[in-house]
């Protein structure tokens, strides 16, 4: 499914579900305004239109909240535990896990600094170091890192609450994790997407 088709479908669902004409959604450190009548997602305060890719993700989050709410189950799971997760894992590993591992091996200090400083993640127990990050409101993602040593390469495990599968499909979870990787590896999500680098992504909404 292309982003254009996914975007139109999401807007149709929002129009049918939403009791309000405007919604404000925070994603990482950015604020977005969803304007239902005009069918547009704007970044605040610049009023710049969000990319189709980010717009779809924000709308799918909003649809999930409107339909189900988001009540954490307190059960951390990995991507492979999602429905169809093992099938999507090779693309997920290529697009998200490998870039993180590359950064962890080359410059772990900057990686952790981005997560805890720029994005407000908090240090928690696990691995050599672990960071818990708020992505969308109440949607926490945990990154567990093991640093490289003389015998073993670096490793990372990404966990999230099982409730996330109630508002996002497996493909959407993969896309969320990809965007997180872009962001905390020091890139601009909107900037990368603007240059059509998502054509290399092996997942779709």
Residue spans of the language-model regions?
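Short amphipathic alpha-helical segments
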Residues: 50-54, 103, 107, 111, ...
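Short glycine-rich, low-complexity/disordered patches
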Residues: 24-25, 69-78, 109-132, 188-205
């Amino acid at each position: 499914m292309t982003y254009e088709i996914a975007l139109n479908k999401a807007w149709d669902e929002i129009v049918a579900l939403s009791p309000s004409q405007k919604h404000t959604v925070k994603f990482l450190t950015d604020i977005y305004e969803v304007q239902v009548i005009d069918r547009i997602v704007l970044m605040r305060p610049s009023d710049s239109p969000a990319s189709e890719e980010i717009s779809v993700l924000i709308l799918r989050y909003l649809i999930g909240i409107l339909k189900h709410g988001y009540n954490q189950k307190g059960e951390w799971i990995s991507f492979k535990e999602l429905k169809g997760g093992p099938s999507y894992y090779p693309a997920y590993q290529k697009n998200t896990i490998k870039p993180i591992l590359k950064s962890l091996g080359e410059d772990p200090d900057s990686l952790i600094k981005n997560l805890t400083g720029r994005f407000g993640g908090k240090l928690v127990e696990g691995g050599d170091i672990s960071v818990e990050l708020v992505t969308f409101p109440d949607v926490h993602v945990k990154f567990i890192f093991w640093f490289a040593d003389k015998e073993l390469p670096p490793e990372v495990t990404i966990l999230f609450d099982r409730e996330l599968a109630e508002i996002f499909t497996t493909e959407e979870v993969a896309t969320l994790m990809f965007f997180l990787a872009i962001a905390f590896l020091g890139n601009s999500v909107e900037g990368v997407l603007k240059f059509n680098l998502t054509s290399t992504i092996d997942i779709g909404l």
